[in-house]
């Protein structure tokens, strides 16, 4: 099947014949590694000099970049950091005239020339030699508007990055945030580790897994839904402070805060507890804000203050206030009645604890604008967590900001006997239709029998964290390549 080319594509393709006649390779390789410079370095170092001073200094530089505009003898190229103007004097370099006349927006070039300034005081490199490195055969998106179709932005992120400087800045900030997170944990004597993506057991979170099959072993595996269990095994092994940052996979819905594969950090610290995990989490968020020079954030018209101490509330107290019913003493019958009143979809295995959590998600989550730790979760929804003084609840907290959950932390359950009982309770829920319940992880139970020190642990969603600090509303805006439905299968 022949591909229909646009007029622009036909023109660009025809130029390949011209390059052949000129003995120019339109898809060149780098023969010699040069000490090239970035435009921002030139601007930082030489912007304060006058044109006359620069001319007398006789400075020559090599630059690489993509052509973003071409006007008369001036060519503007963009590198990773910034743009700079090149000047081509046709009279002095007739040998380059045909090459320059056949350049197009988007072409990637190598220029060598003398640094100077224009009459308006802008830095410019006067071209001495010029080389085409990569010919662009398709026209780039309009430089002023970029890609307008949001689906096309996600499907062709490379074009978005070329044409939209703001998108590029978002992903640079993402990289900086990840570096800051590593710096924080490394400086606090945590050891970064890597654990398997393929798992024998579904455990560590309430989520549906992706399944795969290993041919050589004739065995079914799941892609990990959390890193909690292997990291706790490393606590047992004697690594007192451990963290992992990596991809997690959950076979669930896609929306503005969920993507089937996403990045988290989980960290565990021996001889600590929930209080320490809340302290570490608050420190981390405030460190990132400080390093990014952010005191407040704007989100949907709300100003979020990251400098004040994070609030703390109790889940059951908040549900009791919202419903007008004391949920510490409510009967299951009354809880079911309230759930129906508030449009909660009931499931067979639901207890008062499950219903309290559902009502919290429905009535209260969206109201938590300022950073807030929600504590005191029901034991039914926290199978890996140490119980509180009231055994119906556990030592757990979730951090909410602007109505979204950003972190989940708790004092870790260390008893193999109690952990087995919790896993068995999860199996009972699974039998009643809870397809997000954990299996019994016998290997983990065996590991716990060798003794896990008292510990605190926490998981933070990196993508949501980046959304927060870049003030983005959709997780797709902070993922280079979000999961999308195949075009061919779209109806």
UniProtKB/Swiss-Prot annotation:
Classification via SUPFAM superfamilies: Class II aaRS and biotin synthetases, Nucleic acid-binding proteins
Chain positions recorded as Mg(2+) 1 binding sites: 398, 405
EC id: 6.1.1.6
Molecular function terms from GO: ATP binding; lysine-tRNA ligase activity; magnesium ion binding; tRNA binding
A single Gene Ontology CC term: cytosol
Annotated binding of Mg(2+) 2, by residue: 405
Subcellular localization: Cytoplasm
Cofactor descriptive note: Binds 3 Mg(2+) ions per subunit.
Record field: catalytic activity: tRNA(Lys) + L-lysine + ATP = L-lysyl-tRNA(Lys) + AMP + diphosphate
Keywords: Aminoacyl-tRNA synthetase, ATP-binding, Cytoplasm, Ligase, Magnesium, Metal-binding, Nucleotide-binding, Protein biosynthesis
Broad enzyme group: ligase
Needed cofactors: Mg(2+)
Major subcellular location class: cytoplasm
Family: Belongs to the class-II aminoacyl-tRNA synthetase family.
Oligomer and partners: Homodimer.
HAMAP family reported for this sequence: Lys_tRNA_synth_class2 (MF_00252)
Official protein name in the record: Lysine--tRNA ligase
Upper lineage: Bacteria, Bacillati, Mycoplasmatota, Mycoplasmoidales, Metamycoplasmataceae
Gene (UniProt): lysS
